[in-house]
Amino acid sequence: METYETSIGTQSYPPTLFPPPLGTGGFTTSGYIHALVDSTSNSNSNSNSNSNTNSNTNSNSDTKIPIVQISDDSHITHDSFKPYMEYHDASHLRNRNISKADQVDSTEVMEQFTQWSNYKMRSRSPTINAKPIRHTSQRRTDFTSKNELSKFSKNHNFIFHKGFLKRQHSIRREDRQAKVRSRFRSKKELTSVLNYIELEQMDIANVLASQSVNLHAIRNLTSRDPAVTPIPFLRSQMYATSSRPPYLRNRSIRRKLPKSQPGSLPTTTPATATKTIKQNSTTPTTRSVYNKNVGRSNTSPSVLYHPKRRGKLNTKSHARKEQLLLELWREYLMLVITQRTQLRLTLLCSPGSASNESSVCSSNASDLDMSLLSTPSSLFQMAGETKSNPIIIPDSQDDSILSSDPF
């Protein structure tokens, strides 16, 4: 049997079993368990072990088992725990401020500087919940008799109704606006021209007159519903001449055409293409996607292209894009307000300012604490102003420091 000394006496345990942790075996208290290990406790344990002659005194005196004290106090009064408690309180307060800053809505801070609620209400478009646009049906009376129809059908002729020519004109106009008019009628013509072009001898100024190229139109063509994305600029200096062989150069220029998706712009061959090119071309012809959803009568033109888009307004996509714009604008305004406030506090707490001797500025917090955003009034109290008279830094003036003393 092995003996272990605790604050309540000596307890014995079988050698095959491990003893419970010190200060926890058989105790059910609601207070704190403090293991105070110092020179006094070690000396007391050594004196108690030397007085006991029936047990192994030498082993107990060498191991220096600490004395466990159980206190029911709500706070720690020992001097050795003061640095730990100060660090624990500081970290707990910092974590609480950070969690509050994450949960606090920045609307109160925005209202102190701007009229965000009024702007948000005015920015809502009244046409979001409007009814879908309806096109009135233009019914035309067909005065063709049955005798005329039977006469022309025998000769395999077609009677053009009143709105046929107007509809064909609108189709050609929409087709010209939708597709990009190229100089080449097919891919073979483009490939044949590229085979005779030396990119190393070509002057880039003849192709790109400006210093930058706007890719906004290309992004709108590639995406069906373009979101709020920044417009990149492609510098003309990035087009460097390559020193690769011609066969590799021609292969790198070729690009695969994207697959046609329903709702996207169709890739139709122009009507001026010759018959020889159509016979020799090996690329499969893409069918037009407009014939699937177009529903019109035989005598009246209806919505020709994209009937779903023209017939009604997509309220969900419009609201989503508008919400994204509002969030981006709100984030930008919040960053500007925070930076201006931090700049003002830095100027007030600078060595050359008169408010440097205040208790708030004398602290070690150099950066703007996120907990200040939860209480907007504290921003003005730190700056020495009131809520009715906030600090305003106009954009026309310079934000530079007029003081001669450096930071």
From Swiss-Prot:
Compositionally biased residues, Basic residues: 306-315
Record-listed Phosphoserine modification sites: S260, S264, S300, S302
Chain intervals for the UniProt region annotation (Disordered): 40-64, 251-315
Polar residues bias: start-end ranges: 277-302
Disulphide connectivity of cysteines: none
Motif extent (SUMO-binding): 391-398
Alphabetical keyword list: Cytoplasm, Phosphoprotein
Expression induction: Expression is regulated by the ACE2 and SWI5 transcription factors.
One of the record's GO cellular component terms: cell cortex
Main location: other
Compartment(s) where it occurs, according to its Swiss-Prot or TrEMBL record: Bud neck; Cytoplasm, Cell cortex
Biased composition annotated in UniProt, kind: Low complexity: 40-61, 266-276
Known function: May be involved in a mitotic signaling network. Binds sumoylated proteins and may stabilize SUMO chains.
Subunit description: Interacts with CBF2, GIS1, NAP1, PRM8, REI1, SHS1 and SMT3.
Protein name from the UniProt record: Protein NIS1
